[in-house]
């Protein structure tokens, strides 16, 4: 670290919805010569993922504020004090010019200590319904940023930071116009598999006449591939040229761009990525998400005719098959264009610029 080099500390942990947008901003700041240090949990995915990106880690142990039983509630004051002490030591070691809170349990104690020690705090809320931590810290932060308008009062709508390649895909009008033949369907179950999608989609496709069936790429997580294959075979559909089952997709930008339609959950990052690429989507929100935030995430696009929202309790093979019969490449292209129009492709740059401004620095151009 040089004497003039600025330092950003990113606080984020727990799930990819917090970690991946944090990484996007971290890389943007590094490209501008900033030193970046990450504050996370040793038990979260960030502990293995972030160091692979060449970003040093500091650790805080904290399990959260929401009730998880009587013993956890009794231990909360001790755990919070311990986490605050760990956060204080980390801040003293790193001496950041600005701290960016991207969510996760550790953001609460670390955010409190950031403010109490006089360091500037920038918050970013990824979901359409703010989590408890950000609701509290938003009253103390220098700047508050949101991915969805209205998620927090008096916040700036920047969108969700995403990977650069997602924002650089060809416009949907050109992509869809260049295609012919069967529709292309991408089903994204994520690492957990989305059992409801794995069960309903094969049965829905079986209800379609062979010439009505789209070409399918179905991602389901390594643990669920065998069961998914059995579901397709039970529906009388063999996996081959028109049905490809994959455990993981490395290049999501290309996967989205090559699809006419995506069927998936509606986590904050998924919604942001689909809008950035510009692809038609049928969202089935995870019904047990905290505060049902996946429903309101999906509504942001669905209420503008930029996606379709179906609750899991309403999803059936018959409903899905009937809806698919009514779709054409033109109708899906129109949906994709509306989705793209609602995207915030410069979100990573905007969040980075805010961090730099709060630290009293300038950030050059776009990446």
Curated annotation (Swiss-Prot):
Classification via Pfam families: Glyco_tran_28_C, Glyco_transf_28
Record SUPFAM superfamilies: UDP-Glycosyltransferase/glycogen phosphorylase
Location relative to the cell: Cell inner membrane
UniProt GO molecular function: UDP-N-acetyl-D-glucosamine:N-acetylmuramoyl-L-alanyl-D-glutamyl-meso-2,6-diaminopimelyl-D-alanyl-D-alanine-diphosphoundecaprenol 4-beta-N-acetylglucosaminlytransferase activity; undecaprenyldiphospho-muramoylpentapeptide beta-N-acetylglucosaminyltransferase activity
Keyword hit for Glycosyltransferase: yes
NCBIfam families: murG
Name the UniProt record assigns to this protein: UDP-N-acetylglucosamine--N-acetylmuramyl-(pentapeptide) pyrophosphoryl-undecaprenol N-acetylglucosamine transferase
Organism of origin: Burkholderia pseudomallei (strain 1106a)
Taxonomic placement: Bacteria, Pseudomonadati, Pseudomonadota, Betaproteobacteria, Burkholderiales
Annotated gene: murG
């Amino acid at each position: 670290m040089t004497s003039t080099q600025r330092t950003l500390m990113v606080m984020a942990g727990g799930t990819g919805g917090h970690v991946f947008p944090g990484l996007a901003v971290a890389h943007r700041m590094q490209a501008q010569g900033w030193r970046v240090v990450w504050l996370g949990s040793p038990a979260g995915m960030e502990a293995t993922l972030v160091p692979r990106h060449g970003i040093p880690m500091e650790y805080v142990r904290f399990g959260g504020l929401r009730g998880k039983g009587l013993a956890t509630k009794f231990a909360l004051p001790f755990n919070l004090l311990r986490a605050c002490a760990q956060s204080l030591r980390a801040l003293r070691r790193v001496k950041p010019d600005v701290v960016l809170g991207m969510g996760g349990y550790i953001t609460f104690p670390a955010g409190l200590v950031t403010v109490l020690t006089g360091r500037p705090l920038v918050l970013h809320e990824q979901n359409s319904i703010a989590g408890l931590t950000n609701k509290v810290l938003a009253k103390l932060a220098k700047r508050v940023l949101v991915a969805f308008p209205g998620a927090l009062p008096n916040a700036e709508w920047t969108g969700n930071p995403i990977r650069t390649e997602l924002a650089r895909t060809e416009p949907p009008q050109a992509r869809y116009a260049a295609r012919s033949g069967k529709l292309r369907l991408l089903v994204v179950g994520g690492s957990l598999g989305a059992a409801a999608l794995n069960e309903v989609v094969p049965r829905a496709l079986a209800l379609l006449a062979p010439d009505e069936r789209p070409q399918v790429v179905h991602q389901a997580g390594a643990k669920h591939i065998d069961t998914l294959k059995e579901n397709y075979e039970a529906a009388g559909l063999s996996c081959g040229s028109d049905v490809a089952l994959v455990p993981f997709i490395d290049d999501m930008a290309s996967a989205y761009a090559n699809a006419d339609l995506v069927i998936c959950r509606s986590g904050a990052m998924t919604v942001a990525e689909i809008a950035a690429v510009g692809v038609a989507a049928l969202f089935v929100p995870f019904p047990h998400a905290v505060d049902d935030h996946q429903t309101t995430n999906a509504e942001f696009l669905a209420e503008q005719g930029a996606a379709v929202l179906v609750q899991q309790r309403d999803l059936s093979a018959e409903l899905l098959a009937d809806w698919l019969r009514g779709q054409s490449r033109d109708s899906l292209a129109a949906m994709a264009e509306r989705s793209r129009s609602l995207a915030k492709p410069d979100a990573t740059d905007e969040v980075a610029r805010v961090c730099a401004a709060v630290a009293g620095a300038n950030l050059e151009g776009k990446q």
